[in-house]
A protein has these predicted regions:
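Non-catalytic, well-ordered alpha-helical scaffold segments
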Residues: 1, 14, 33, 47, ...
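Generic detection of long, well-ordered alpha-helical segments
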Residues: 6-10, 32-43, 82-89, 117-121, ...
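Non-catalytic, polymerase-adjacent accessory regions of viral genome-replication enzymes
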Residues: 1-47
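Intrinsically disordered or highly flexible coil/loop and linker segments, enriched in small
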Residues: 13, 22, 26, 58-59, ...
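Reverse-transcriptase-like RNA-dependent polymerase core
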Residues: 9-18, 52-73, 87, 94, ...
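Short, conserved non-catalytic motifs in the polymerase core
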Residues: 26-36, 61-87, 104-118
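Active-site-proximal segment of RNA-dependent polymerases
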Residues: 1-7, 95-152
Length: 155
């Protein structure tokens, strides 16, 4: 089974939905459809997404842009996709995580972002461990607006 078939399967999309449905039920994209509203007709919507993915007719919608306040009067731009797009994105993420599992495991201790079970706490613990072993340099990298620059059409 190829990657597109795995991602577009009803089972994969249901799994993706199960991981999304718990979060911020009032969050919405440009159309205003919330997770709670999607949930009311989720089976039909998942079947429709699956069919359109398999037929090659699925189109990502434009994102809703918002500014999240940060400290010192600064703002962080955020792009919020439609709920259906989030289901597809999550299905892709689940499949890619499985596909690259071995590579991700090899990078443990080097990268802590966007990996299940890793976060700031684990990064700080690893930095302390490296310091105790004589290392004295840390590289911190942040790709500004990475997700905003991903070409959705090429996905």
């Amino acid at each position: 089974m190829n990657l597109l078939n795995k991602i577009s399967s009803v089972e994969s999309l249901r799994l993706a939905w199960a991981k999304l449905e718990k979060f911020n039920k009032e969050s919405h994209g440009l159309t205003g459809e919330t997770i709670a509203e999607f949930e009311l007709n989720k089976e039909d919507k998942i079947l429709s997404i699956s069919k359109r993915l398999q037929e090659g007719t699925y189109q990502f919608s434009p994102y809703r842009a918002v500014l999240i306040p940060k400290s010192k009067g600064k703002f962080r731009p955020l792009q919020i996709p439609e709920v259906s797009d989030r289901v597809v994105i999550k299905a892709i993420a689940i499949e890619l995580e499985e596909h690259f599992k071995e590579l991700l495991e090899k990078s443990r201790g080097l990268s802590f972002a966007y990996q299940k079970g890793l976060g700031v706490k684990e990064a700080v613990e690893k930095i302390n461990e490296y310091c105790q072993n004589g290392y004295s340099y840390v590289l911190e990298a942040d790709l500004i607006n990475f997700f905003g620059t991903v070409d959705k059409d090429s996905l």
